[in-house]
């Protein structure tokens, strides 16, 4: 289901999009603040207003990650896979942030020394990619390629131009918006985008729950699917069965500010690496 259709369905069920807008944006946390100051060259005293102005423009699309400014909570560097990802990109590997929103995690990589030409970002909404360029004020300098695409569209530029061309796919806070069977399709697509060789890597940051009955109560309103550890492993078992590929899956619980603020009980952030063998 397209996000616009999801929102329309939710509104008809009594959901108020304005409930996602936080009026308590009073500071910009690290590391986003340093990146905006040092990479984007925004004067320190102007950073908060710059972020507020962009957040208000972006809230034309009333998603929680925008209304609550959680796009500022950068997390890629907290993954235990980050040193490997950064090192590989510095050495020439190509990384895609799938469902990248404003491309904020890609700017973390660039700030830490990754060549921007080795980085790709893809999102369903081209407006988000443009807003990212405005947020980080790097339109004249960034060499990364941003592709607006539906990951499940076989004819999209993402699929026709990058299949088999990538080395790492990073997926953060994206899979849960699909039901279980569609998540399998997305996982298989991510594998198709990777070079067909050992070492090709998917790194995920996934909203997970200790009690699936609570976590998936939103199904009455939206077709989200929150994993527990067992269902997450089952997903990748299915992917291996259907593709014939052998994958090494490693999981960990990741300390995460967004999980701590989540309104549902028992929500945590599941980190995972899926490596082709």
Curated annotation (Swiss-Prot):
Protein residues bound to S-adenosyl-L-methionine: 123-124, 150-152
Pathway involvement of the protein, from the record: Secondary metabolite biosynthesis; terpenoid biosynthesis
InterPro entries: Meroterpenoid_MTases, SAM-dependent_MTases_sf
Domain of life: Eukaryota
EC number(s) on file: 2.1.3.-
Key words of the record: Methyltransferase, S-adenosyl-L-methionine, Transferase
GO biological process terms, semicolon-separated: methylation; terpenoid biosynthetic process
An example molecular function term from Gene Ontology annotations: methyltransferase activity
Known function: Methyltransferase; part of the gene cluster that mediates the biosynthesis of andrastins, meroterpenoid compounds that exhibit inhibitory activity against ras farnesyltransferase, suggesting that they could be promising leads for antitumor agents. The first step of the pathway is the synthesis of 3,5-dimethylorsellinic acid (DMOA) by the polyketide synthase adrD via condensation of one acetyl-CoA starter unit with 3 malonyl-CoA units and 2 methylations. DMAO is then converted to farnesyl-DMAO by the prenyltransferase adrG.
Oligomer status and interactors: Homodimer.
The family this protein is said to belong to: Belongs to the class I-like SAM-binding methyltransferase superfamily.
Record protein name field: Methyltransferase adrK
Annotated gene: adrK
């Amino acid at each position: 289901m397209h996000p616009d259709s999801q929102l329309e369905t939710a509104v008809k069920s009594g959901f108020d999009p304005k409930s996602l807008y936080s009026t308590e944006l009073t500071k910009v946390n690290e590391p986003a603040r340093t990146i905006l100051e040092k990479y984007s060259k925004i004067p320190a005293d102007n950073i908060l207003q710059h972020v507020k102005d962009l957040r208000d423009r972006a809230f034309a699309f009333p998603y929680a990650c925008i209304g609550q400014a959680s796009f500022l909570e950068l997390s890629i560097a907290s993954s235990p896979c980050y040193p490997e990802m950064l090192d590989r990109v510095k050495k020439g590997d190509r990384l895609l942030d799938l469902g990248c929103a404003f491309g904020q995690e890609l700017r973390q990589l660039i700030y830490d020394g990754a060549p921007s030409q080795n980085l790709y970002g893809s999102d369903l909404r081209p407006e988000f990619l443009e807003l990212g360029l405005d947020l980080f004020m790097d339109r004249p300098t960034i060499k990364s390629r941003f592709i607006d695409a539906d990951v499940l569209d076989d004819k999209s530029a993402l699929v026709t131009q990058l299949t088999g061309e990538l080395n790492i796919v990073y997926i953060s806070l994206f899979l849960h918006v699909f039901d279980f069977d569609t998540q399998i399709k997305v996982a298989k697509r991510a594998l198709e985008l990777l070079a067909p060789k050992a070492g090709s890597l998917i790194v995920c940051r996934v909203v997970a729950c200790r009690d699936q009955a609570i976590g998936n109560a939103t199904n009455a309103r939206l077709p989200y699917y929150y994993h527990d550890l067992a269902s997450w492993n089952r997903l990748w078992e299915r992917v291996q069965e259907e593709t014939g590929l052998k994958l090494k899956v490693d999981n960990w619980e990741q300390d995460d500010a967004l999980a701590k603020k989540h309104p549902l009980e028992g929500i945590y952030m599941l980190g995972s690496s899926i490596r082709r063998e």
